[in-house]
Amino acid sequence: MLRNTPFGATPTYKLLLGFGLCSLGGAMLYAYFKTRNDEEEADSGGQRPASGIRGQTEEQKPQKEVCLKIVVDNEHVPLIMGRGGSNIKLIEEKTLAKIRLRDKDSGHKFCDISGVPDAVKAARALLIKEIERAPVVKVELQVPQRLASKINGRGGELLQEIRSSSLAKLNIDLNGRNGKAKITIIGNQKQVNIARKMLDDQIEEDEELVRSMEEVEQRREPRRSPTNSIASSMYSSQTSLSSHTQPRDKLMASKGEGKPMEVYVSAVASPTKFWVQLIGPQSKKLDSMVQEMTSYYSSAENRAKHVLTAPYVGQIVAAVFKFDEKWYRAEIVDIMPNQYNPKEQVIDLYFVDYGDSEYISPADICELRTDFLTLRFQAVECFLANVKSTIQTEPITWPKSSIAKFEELTEVAHWRKLIARVVTYKERPRATTAVSAAAKEGTPLPGVELFDPADNSELNIADLMITQGFALPLDDSYPVRSRSSTPSSNSDSTIEELCVSNPVTPLTPHSPMSMSIDVDSITQAENEHLAQQLQHLQHKLNGNDIKNINPAKLTATDLENGNNNNASTTNGASAH
């Protein structure tokens, strides 16, 4: 349009037209290439730009740092640090975590690990690995064999407890010398220290027990004279209604210990009918109780509070023993007329903690103070295994000479320590006058081998009886062993471990591994018998609850009523 005008012929017009055409061409080229690039990116995967954007977003949002605090023993700090801190530096370089140690207490330090979670986790794993490569320590201890047997017994419960608590390896060698066993502890220093501490506690407990037993042996006096022991044991009835129940605390503690038991022979009727006390903490408790009973019942005023006016068979009472003038717990087995004075009565008593019996006048018997029932009865009836009487026609009747020899060898009631091991059992004769559940059930009697630990050897008492002509072997196959025969320390039987669940013949030998006991039935029988005593005493207290009675706060009226009703009250001691 401007081309035909005078302006169209000017150079300015031509310049403007050239710039315009170039600009239009450039714009068209840009639009073309832009469209082509978009189409190519769409064909080759148009999601790539979005991925790139997400990656940039994640990189812009770093992980949050965390700090983990662990506690390490001072003895492990050198392992973590390394020479000049080289270990920590190496771990920090590998994991990009930061590690700092600071004091916690005298024996430990805090180890703070900071960084991103993955780095902290990796650093912790490397630190634990360094701690676990602590040098292995081996320690050997010499302990008494009885303690080693205790640790290794009861299915190894105590041994497993030490292993699990310390994470150390423990091995026990019972075949040591001079009555010692060797315990080997293997682990790092911390594990060994923990195991050693737990073993030291057991050693201290065992030494305390030995000291207590030595004190008992020094303080105990002979309970009866040898000249009187035969008559008393042979001619008193000794058919206790409750003596079949072993002391439950000792039974539960030693069940399955797998070792011979230390015992005192406390009373003897014959080699096939005698009583033992298990040596242990209860021995000292028994002596303390006898001392307290003697002190209490020696007072005429106290005896007046516990007058026995209506005795009954099966009642647990307090009675004075004429030989030593001490007071003991006893059970009334029978009440009968005095053969020298039919108008008077005589009471046949079984001393539940010792096993012997006496005929005693009711005047020398009192009702038992209730708190004296707390300790379990200590006498355990046994028979000597593998022997029989020299009287062929009456194998259960023993000559007085044989009984006297057996009393001499066992030092009955003179508190000589013997070793007993259960090797068999037989059914107990059922008592026709029994009122306790245990007697009605006819619990089995343990047959034991007795050993005298003298002159660094253990003499088998049954063998001595046979070789000296005071007994015969139970059968021809019985081997008379050396006089220094030693009971196996690996035996799994104890005096308490009797099997009452399976039918048996009257005399059934069993391997030590098969000996066990129905604890619940025996415990229930003894509890029922004690409950009967408490029920009787509660009735005497006019229906008052024994548990709620404070003897120190009884009024004069209460005491007067108690005496009128023969109540069994306590003076200055709590009833249980």
Curated annotation (Swiss-Prot):
Q: In which tissues is it expressed?
A: Ovaries (at protein level). Expressed in the ovary and testis.
Q: What InterPro entries has UniProt attached to this entry?
A: KH_dom (IPR004087), KH_dom_type_1 (IPR004088), KH_dom_type_1_sf (IPR036612), SNase_OB-fold_sf (IPR035437), TDRD2-like_tudor (IPR047380), Tudor (IPR002999), Tudor_domain_containing (IPR050621)
Task: Provide one Gene Ontology biological process annotation.
Answer: spermatogenesis
Q: What result is annotated for mutating Y359R?
A: Decreased binding to piwi
Which residue stretches does the UniProt record annotate as biased composition, category Basic and acidic residues?
209-224
Q: Which UniProt keywords apply?
A: Cytoplasm, Nucleus
**Consequence the record notes for mutating Y328A:** Unable to rescue fertility and transposon activation defects in mutants. Abolishes binding to piwi
| CC terms in the record's Gene Ontology section | mitochondrion; nucleus; P granule; protein-containing complex
Q: Where is this region: Disordered?
A: 40-60, 209-253, 556-576
**All copies of domain KH, residue ranges:** 65-127, 136-199
Per UniProt, the ranges with Low complexity bias are 232-243, 561-576
Description of the deletion phenotype: RNAi-mediated knockdown does not produce a visible phenotype. However, fertility is reduced with egg-laying decreased by 30%. AGO3 protein levels are decreased and AGO3 is delocalized from the nuage. No effect on nuage morphology and no mislocalization of piwi and aub. RNAi-mediated knockdown in germline tissues results in delocalization of AGO3 from the nuage.
Q: Which Pfam families match?
A: KH_1, TUDOR
Subunit composition and interactions? Interacts (via C-terminus) with AGO3 (via the N-terminal region when symmetrically methylated on arginine residues); this interaction is RNA-independent and may be required for AGO3 localization to the nuage. Interacts (via Tudor domain) with piwi (via N-terminus). Interacts with tral and me31B.
What this chain does, per the entry, is described as: Involved in the piwi-interacting RNA (piRNA) metabolic process, which mediates the repression of transposable elements during meiosis by forming complexes composed of piRNAs and Piwi proteins, and governs the methylation and subsequent repression of transposons which is essential for germline integrity. Likely to act by recruiting Piwi proteins such as AGO3 and piwi to the piRNA biogenesis machinery in the nuage. Required for the final steps of primary piRNA biogenesis by participating in the 3' end-trimming of piwi-bound intermediates into mature piRNAs.
Share the domain note from the entry.
Answer: The Tudor domain is sufficient for binding to the N-terminus (1-14) of both unmethylated piwi or piwi symmetrically dimethylated at 'Arg-10'. However, it may not be sufficient for binding to symmetrically dimethylated AGO3, instead this interaction may require a larger region of the C-terminus which includes the Tudor domain (257-576).
Protein name as catalogued: Tudor and KH domain-containing protein homolog
